[in-house]
């Protein structure tokens, strides 16, 4: 558990004969996607370890970074993923963030409706809808507004101590 940094289940690990991690898949998925992930893990060029070596070697083209971010996502390597996302986003023209292939990357940059990039989503709403679909975009915007309310719903902000009579 400690050696492979397993924090919860399900974790699927592909190891070499010496027990070294080659690829990691965290969470469940439908069978076709799971098969794709396992096939990737068995490919030395596309597995987590292979792609990490390429990244450390300086590989930084857009397609590679997008693919690597996807691998890091499936491996639940959030800290490293976030640093790769920052490199990736810095290479893009802001309008490229609107594209469907960048939706999950763009949304990972947002914590809630107060996030720095949230106004970009609202200002480019029609373009995001055209690329990603109205339901997906609308649902995501709703979630961003709801996240602002979470601290009050769970009393992280001292809501119960707030005295309405003082207002």
Per-segment meaning from a language model:
Residues 6-47:
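Non-catalytic, surface beta->alpha helical segment in thiol-disulfide oxidoreductase systems
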Residues 44-59:
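Sec-dependent signal peptide cleavage junction
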Residues 1-2:
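Compositionally biased alpha-helical segments
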Residues 55-167:
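Oxidative protein folding and maturation machinery
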